UniProtKB/Swiss-Prot annotation:
Compartment(s) of residence: Cell inner membrane
Keyword Cytoplasm attributed: no
UniProt KW Disulfide bond keyword: no
Gene symbol of the encoding locus: lepA
Residues binding GTP, per UniProt: 14-19, 131-134
GO molecular function: GTP binding; GTPase activity; guanosine tetraphosphate binding; ribosome binding; translation elongation factor activity
Protein name: Elongation factor 4
């Protein structure tokens, strides 16, 4: 056991985690030269296209150190985006240490900080690594200084390496073996294994990634899931070297995969503890704290026949992504679907794309909203995650919106632009600290503004140098209103949005103008209105198409023309009473962009 090292690689987006993993795999000979590819651990095609890591991946390698001993390295490559921070915290729970990778050109960024504190909270040993020293812009001394100033861990002898060229990677491995402690655990104790992650395989059923904390797990053992009390047979188990390799036994302290032929998706939830049926452990391991979704949106299949397969797909996906939340919802405009909760907009985009690709579904999304706390006049508190669930205005005593605490790091020269942006987003400054050339800003900004497009705007005002980390702080009373969209005097529930009263006029007008461009012209006038309660704040009309009924009158009597025009008018009026307006898919997506292109 003293020759096992479990560690994660944590860093900000694009600081070179996945490339460093590639080098480590190469040095330890986990894959042959032929099988090696760039970012070999980003196995989803979505990950490869966007060049980001979405799922944490684990690998087991053997490393022959300079002291002649062979060490078993179990490491987990983690995502860098704030939307997938749950993946990171789960991976860290399975480790004794973490490699903190910092780009020597960019220096410390917000996610570096957030992930590092997560690791330190779990009492892990953090080993700083300065990456990308081959870049002309690299300044490793400044980066090391920043790590000490901002993060507060000793970085005087941080390893300097370049994952791309492979310089210094052997030193990283030596440092790992030296600084990160071996796993603590008792091989003789009853089995306790933590489920870090699981996914659904069409042939094998549920495959789980487990970390054996105490005891050993053998092929053919009867395994008991502690939360449900059900028992399964351990059919196959093994390790990843990124390839799946079968083994007969997983020892204490190891990380490996397990197949128990579980067909039920909820059979072995993530964060649960596995033990042996014949000598069970007394208590379960502490799991993971549940994360609360920050953004909610409705997902609806375009054709209602897909509802069943959509439900199954969501089930399988939520097994793989423990932070996804969903419940059935029905809408008059869109039929049956699900209300889903996500950690952020990127998470939402990824989930939607995964559903469409991996399960061949065609989906419509409604506008994302955050959760509001509403105190009704009858003194009860309800949480509202969709505009259609908001009680009528006269029943609301007060409405509170979620406030996010945003930590931003940026070079000094962009400070002015960023502050202007934060004020525009109704932010309140709580803290500002200078570290050398970097400024750390803390703002309290309404969650609704943060999830909409704050990140994109922050990146563009700071030329990509500013970085952001945010978390939910509290609910705060605010003057929010629901803007309804009426088309020919009928409310369309899927188009409603909740916004601040100050922005409501602007938002309403913009939404109505957008809808006007997207709804095709019909044989009659279509009135598009935005309303708060009964008060109409904006209107646009899509003009009717009409035939020139006077074409056949050459000169002639004016009363004849009047008669023909009146006849046409009456016909249009009758048509308007019975006519239905088909809304194109783009109309629902228009909401997503309201307030973006200022």
């Amino acid at each position: 056991m003293k020759h096992i090292r479990n560690f994660s690689i944590i860093a900000h987006i694009d600081h070179g985690k996945s490339t460093l993993s590639d080098r480590i795999i190469q040095i330890c000979g986990g894959l042959t030269e032929r099988e090696m590819a760039a970012q070999v651990l980003d196995s989803m095609d979505l990950e490869r296209e966007r060049g980001i890591t979405i799922k944490a991946q684990s690998v087991t390698l053997d490393y022959k150190a300079q002291d002649g001993q062979t060490y078993q390295l179990n490491f987990i490559d983690t995502p860098g985006h704030v939307d997938f921070s749950y993946e990171v915290s789960r991976s860290l729970a399975a480790c004794e240490g973490a490699l903190l990778v910092v780009d020597a050109g960019q220096g410390v960024e917000a996610q570096t900080l957030a992930n590092c504190y997560t690791a330190l909270d779990m009492n892990l040993e953090v080993v700083p690594v300065l990456n990308k020293i081959d870049l002309p812009a690299a300044d490793p001394d400044r980066a090391a200084q920043e790590i000490e100033d901002i993060v507060g861990i000793d970085a005087t002898d941080a390893v300097r390496c370049s994952a791309k060229t492979g310089v210094g990677v052997p030193e990283v491995l030596e440092r790992l073996v030296r600084d990160i402690p071996g796993p603590a655990g008792d091989p003789e104790a009853p089995l306790q294994a933590l489920i870090i992650d699981s996914w659904f395989d069409n042939y094998l059923g549920v495959v789980s990634l487990v970390r054996v904390k105490n005891g050993t797990m053998r092929k053919g053992d009867k395994i008991k899931v502690m939360s449900t009390g059900q028992t399964y047979n351990a059919d196959r188990l093994g390790i990843f070297t990124p390839k799946r390799v079968d083994r007969d036994v997983l020892n204490c302290g190891e990380v490996g995969w397990l197949v128990c032929a579980i067909k039920d998706i909820l059979g072995a939830p993530v964060g649960d503890t596995l033990t042996l049926a014949r000598q069970p452990a007394d208590k379960a391991l502490p799991g993971f704290k549940k994360v609360k979704p920050q953004v909610y949106a409705g997902l609806f299949p375009i054709s209602s026949d897909d509802y069943e397969s959509f439900r199954d797909a969501l089930g399988k996906l939520s097994l793989n992504d423990a932070s996804l939340f969903y419940e059935p919802e029905s809408s008059t405009a869109l039929g049956f679907g699900f209300r889903c909760g996500f950690l952020g907009l990127l998470h939402m985009e990824i989930i939607q794309e995964r559903l469409e690709r991996e399960y061949d579904l065609e989906l419509i999304t409604t506008a994302p909203t955050v959760v509001y706390e509403v105190e009704t006049t009858s003194k009860e508190t309800i949480y509202v995650d969709s505009p259609s669930k908001l009680p009528p205005l006269n029943n609301i005593e007060e409405l509170r919106e979620p406030i996010a605490e945003c930590h931003m790091l940026m070079p000094q020269e962009f400070l002015g632009n960023v502050i202007t942006l934060c004020i525009e987003k109704r932010g309140v400054q709580t803290n500002m600290v200078y570290h050398g050339n970097q400024v750390a800003l803390t703002y309290e900004i309404p969650m609704a503004e943060v999830v909409l497009d704050f990140f994109d705007r922050l990146k563009s005002t700071s030329r990509g140098y500013a970085s952001l980390d945010y978390n939910f702080k509290r609910f705060q009373t605010s003057d929010m209103v629901r803007v309804d969209v009426l088309i020919n005097n009928e409310r369309v529930d899927a188009l409603a949005l909740i916004t601040h009263r100050d922005n409501s006029q602007y938002r309403g007008r913009e939404l109505v103008e957008k809808m006007k461009e997207l709804i095709p012209r019909q044989q009659f006038d279509i009135a598009i209105q935005a309303a708060i309660g009964t008060h109409i704040i904006a209107r646009a009309t899509v003009k009717q198409l009409r035939k020139n009924v006077l074409a056949k009158c050459y000169g002639g009597d004016v009363s004849r023309k009047k008669k023909l025009l009146q006849k046409q008018k009456d016909g249009k009026k009758r048509m308007k009473q019975v006519g239905n307006v088909e809304l194109p898919q783009e109309a629902f997506l228009a909401i997503l962009h309201v307030g973006k292109d200022k």
